[in-house]
Amino acid sequence: MFALLASLASCAYYLQHEEKSFLSWMRSTNQFYTGDEYQTRFGIFLANQRLVKEHNAANKKFTVALNKFAAYTPAEYKALLGFRMDLKKRVAVKSTKKANAESLDWRDKGVVNGIKDQAQCGSCWAFSTVQAIESADAISTGTLQSFSEQNLVDCVTSCFGCNGGLMTEAFQYVIDNQNGQWCLESDYVYKAVDGICQFSKYSHVGSISKYVNVNEGDEDDLAAKCEQYGPVAVAIDASNWSFQLYHGGIYDESSCSPSNLDHGVGCVGYGSEDGTKYWIVRNSWGTSWGEKGYIRMIWKNNQCGIASMATLPFA
């Protein structure tokens, strides 16, 4: 009887301690729940807390943390992953060059904007497209501007706004229907919901004339084209919980698929640490996720499909 009471007391203490952690997490992420939803979110939080502790105790190349997605339902997380697979054959010409630099970071060259946040909208494809065009335009003109993701969410008829899309479709739409031009983010503000196309309402800037694909699955080609032309719009498999809760280090996830791609991001360079090569990948989940909004993904066997569907625009 005494043992049972001691066990119950220990369990109660554990839950009380963990609930304090959950309440602290809610305050830090500005996410508040009550009633039945509170209990549901608390359960998800506890499950992810166990995963985080087990993973970090294993001393892997990267760490995970209880970030703002730590109490997300699977459906909520999946809604962020808005890249829609394109089964059409892609045309790519392999670069005749190899990357010369041992490391490359386009952020150091003043042609990459700060991290943005797509919020609870599956518009990653629009953010992936825009970051590549912003950098291409900056490399061409010497002026870095912030272009409108909402322009794409509202206007690209071959994509589905907050329900997903393709970067190549967005590039083609801008070339065919907007004369390669763009609206500024300050004019056409991001709202994280689908709306009516208002491209004609605002003044237009920038210009892209074409885009080129990276040879499918070829990381050497990705490096060469990134060095030659600038940041790349890439699709990856981000479905794993370890990506959702990524905190820092070189992301090396053996269960990551090179072909089941679901998330649009940007590749702004590459480097190495202690002999391990990695890609510098820009996400659109705000600066509280990962390494101030970035993730370093291992350069090995096209893990997570980093080079499977990668595209670069030309200004």
Give each language-model segment a name.
Residues 7-315:
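Catalytic-core signature of thiol
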Residues 1-7:
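Classical eukaryotic N-terminal signal peptides for Sec-dependent ER targeting/secretion
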